[in-house]
Regions:
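Catalytic Walker B motif of ABC-type/P-loop ATPase nucleotide-binding domains
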Residues: 149-152
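Conserved ABC ATPase signature
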Residues: 124-128, 132
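Conserved ABC ATPase "signature" region
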Residues: 95-119
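H-loop/switch region of ABC-family ATPase nucleotide-binding domains
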Residues: 185-186
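The feature captures the beta-strand-to-loop junction immediately N-terminal to the Walker
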Residues: 17-19
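Helix-to-loop junction immediately C-terminal to a conserved catalytic motif
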Residues: 32
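Conserved ABC transporter NBD signature motif
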Residues: 40-50, 59
Length: 240
């Protein structure tokens, strides 16, 4: 990454779009403190995301992170996978899952309902469909009670209908929980459909930023590329 300058307002649904290897996932890892920039800086609520920063470590649970791999534990139940999300917030170890506070179990049930998985609490994660696994990953992140949700290619390899179901779910959770959502996509059309702002990353540099209101592009900032060329990069018809 080089010369990437992003300013993301609280409550925004912000999409980062780019082809494989462009640096999108690296950006998310920098935001949650998993990586440290060799140059430049990142601030979240005036704090630098760094595991050595004690103040940042205390507020880490406010950043929900969904990796592209989803990170589910395959041989445990949906409920236990979701409860794992609360462990950092409660400063507990995974070994206490069976003695979890009743109020947290009720909160997990509420979130299961929010993500459309009520009645599947005891099902093992490996038995779930691709869309269901993503719902569990979202629920686990929401159990952290975050203010920021980072999601890396959350709908990759899903069909058109399931992709939009998952995106609708995230939008619903964002509104109900007052979240800032920062999501990595490779699909420009999907990003424009759901995000308030879209940044396009190419070879580690931001080459475009778009502001979106409804179906209208209200702000278009770019260097050398036209919007038609950007759309063509991502196999999207700008007329659609």
């Amino acid at each position: 990454l080089e010369g990437v300058n992003l300013s993301i307002d609280r409550g925004t649904n912000y999409a980062i779009v780019g082809q494989s290897g462009s640096g999108k996932s690296t950006l998310l890892k920098l935001m949650n403190g998993m990586m440290t920039p060799s140059k430049g800086s990142i601030k979240i609520d005036y704090l630098t995301p760094n595991m050595n920063n004690k103040k940042f470590k205390k507020m880490m649970h406010t950043i929900g992170y969904i990796p592209q791999s989803l990170g589910l534990v395959k041989n445990i139940s949906v409920m236990d996978n979701i409860l794992i999300g609360a462990l950092p917030r409660l400063n507990l170890m995974q070994s206490v899952l069976k003695q979890f506070p009743e109020n947290e179990i009720q909160e997990a049930k509420n979130i299961l309902k929010l993500v459309g998985l009520s009645g599947k609490e005891s099902r093992k994660a490996y038995m779930l469909s691709g869309g269901e696994k993503r719902r569990v990953a979202i629920a686990r992140a929401l159990m952290q009670k975050p203010t920021i949700l980072l999601a890396d290619e959350i709908v990759s390899e899903l069909d058109h209908v399931t992709s939009r179901e998952i995106m609708d779910l995230i939008l619903d959770a964002q509104k109900k929980m007052n979240l800032t959502a920062i999501m990595v996509h490779h699909d420009m059309k999907l990003a424009l459909e759901y995000a308030n702002r879209v940044a396009v990353i190419k070879e580690g540099q931001k080459i475009l930023e778009i502001g979106v209101e409804g179906d209208t592009i209200v702000d278009f900032q770019t260097g050398d590329l036209s919007i038609e060329e950007i759309m063509e990069m991502h196999n999207t018809d700008p007329k659609e």
